[in-house]
Amino acid sequence: MYFSHQNRAHGSRRLAKETADALAQAETRGLISEVMYNEDQPRMTQMVLLPLLQQLGLQSRWQLWLTPQQRLSREWVESAGLPLTKVMQVSQMNPQVTLDSMIRALETGNYSVVIAWLHDDLTDDEHRRLTEAAEKGNAMGFLMRPVQPSLPGDRPRSGLRIHSRMVH
């Protein structure tokens, strides 16, 4: 049983790394994605995002974290394999300021990735503005959205929404 779980975990990590490599090496014009996650399972989100963030850390650009209240710990950044000298954080922002800051940061081209926490769904106009900003700055933006744990018998709601012209 343990061996089976270990193989699945290794396969998931390998797939996440391959996906991260492909995304980081692709010539993208910008990307906005929403990551819905369960706060009770942070390791799952880390398995998906960390390989990509590590790859983006190889670029000369910054990584910007717009966090609601929590501060990133230096120990976590280092243990996650992220470049401490390229990670910037701004915390305790209200949602509208967070959205506007994310748009401005993406547009500059100074950041390889901008990560922000928002609880409400985006309007079509907000999503359009973010997408245009990401394309202009050739950057990736991740909107982190915590979801409530599902009730027993409910379908899990956590997931990754990747908005791309290739699929739409």
From Swiss-Prot:
UniProt xrefs under Pfam families: SulA
Where is region (Lon protease binding) located? 161-168
| InterPro entries referenced in this protein's UniProt entry, alphabetically | Cell_div_suppressor_SulA, P-loop_NTPase, SulA_CellDiv_inhibitor, SulA_enterobact
According to its UniProt entry, the protein's GO biological process terms are: division septum assembly; DNA repair; negative regulation of cell division; SOS response
- Which stretches of sequence are listed as region FtsZ binding? 105-111
Has the keyword Cytoplasm been applied to this entry?
Answer: no
Q: Which UniProt keywords apply?
A: Cell cycle, Cell division, DNA damage, Septation, SOS response
Q: Does the keyword Zinc apply?
A: no
Site feature Essential for degradation by Lon protease, where = H168
The PTM entry states: Is rapidly cleaved and degraded by the Lon protease once DNA damage is repaired.
Induction comment: By DNA damage, as part of the SOS response.
Q: Which family does it belong to?
A: Belongs to the SulA family.
Its function, per the record, reads: Component of the SOS system and an inhibitor of cell division. Accumulation of SulA causes rapid cessation of cell division and the appearance of long, non-septate filaments. In the presence of GTP, binds a polymerization-competent form of FtsZ in a 1:1 ratio, thus inhibiting FtsZ polymerization and therefore preventing it from participating in the assembly of the Z ring. This mechanism prevents the premature segregation of damaged DNA to daughter cells during cell division.
Its subunit composition reads:
Interacts with FtsZ.
Please state what the protein is called: Cell division inhibitor SulA
UniProt source species: Cronobacter turicensis (strain DSM 18703 / CCUG 55852 / LMG 23827 / z3032)
